[in-house]
Amino acid sequence: MNLHRIMVQIALVLTSVVILLGAYTRLSDAGLGCPDWPGCYGHLTVPNTAAELSVVEDNFPGMMVEPSKAWLEMIHRYFAGSLGVLIFAITLLCLFKAKAPKVVPIVLSLLVVAQALLGMWTVTMKLMPVVVMAHLLGGFLLFVLLAILYCQLKPTEFMVDWQFVDPRLRFFSFFVIAVVALQILLGGWTSSNYAALMCSELPICEGDWVSYLDWKNAFDFWNLGHHTYEFGVLEYPARMTIHVTHRIGAMVTFFCVMTYCFWLYQQSEPIVQQLAIAIGLVLLAQVGLGISNVLYQLPLSVAVAHNLGAALLIMLVSVSSYVLWQEQPGIELNIEGFKYE
């Protein structure tokens, strides 16, 4: 299955690039750089000639093409489209290969279709936060499933001997995945509501922030009736509440994931220990990036890296859980009529 593995490796790299481009596009306020989908002002590329701009004026009255933002959006779409085609190809190869995994590739292809729809709705629904958040989560899920598929294509390298692994750890891994996923949702909700700069002090927020908490409006996921959601529609109390929740979630996530890392490292299996180190390093990097976002007022490079760090964290935690559940086949010996397992 060498071809399968190579293609999945390429897909993993391409997915990380798409995640970076998506974050860069969103944080550069270029999410509506092209107001239609899948093209840009009715073109496959960004219109720039006099004739093309004349057509834009006729079909999109009152709108002005911003080339820098439009190109950011289209480059993101080109990479995302290429990733989708690659995943479809991987799925077909797996379906026609007798011993190749089937379920994960099919789910990946379905997820690509869902991501395309969410990408379209992100534009047509003018950056509605719940759609933006779902699109972000879908991209991370693609990353996770591709990593799991890679493990399935190299099964002997991602197995452990259960007698050397605490059985409670396998179930705890599910809890940690849920915690990290929830924190990613909170991060996506913070970003899509433009709430990342609502608190400028550590560890929680400045002033009497408790008296400003507005839970009702902060988590109204179906906040309808707005012509556009670009730059946010919520008032300060709601945005501040979202930001505070994300910070508290970060503290809970740090405690849970660090506990998980120490527990993983105590196991005797080398691959489990390696994953523990990798998860711990990414977690510490995420904390540093999150603090830097606050101290330096959300620099673009740091914010984009924070997005990729979140994707790496959920991927590594998910892979560690997968590995913990892959039991290494027992070794059978027959010596003079006796059978040992």
Protein language model regions, located:
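Interfacial segments of alpha-helical transmembrane regions
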Residues: N2-V17, P101-L108, D161-L182, V272-L281
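N-terminal signal-anchor transmembrane alpha helix
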Residues: I6-P38, A178-T190
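Interfacial helix-loop-helix junctions of multi-pass membrane proteins
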Residues: Y24-D36, V113-L136, W189-E201, R239, ...
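Extracytosolic (periplasmic/ER-lumenal) interhelical loops and adjacent juxtamembrane/interface segments
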Residues: A30-E73, A196-Y236
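Membrane-interface loop-to-helix entry segments
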Residues: W71-A89, V130-L142, T241-T259, A303-L312
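Membrane-interface helix-loop-helix junctions at transmembrane boundaries of multi-pass membrane enzymes
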Residues: L92-I106, P167, C261-I279, E336-K339
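A juxtamembrane structural motif centered on a specific transmembrane helix
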Residues: I148-F172, M315-E341
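Helical hairpin unit composed of two closely spaced alpha helices linked by a short loop
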Residues: A238-L295
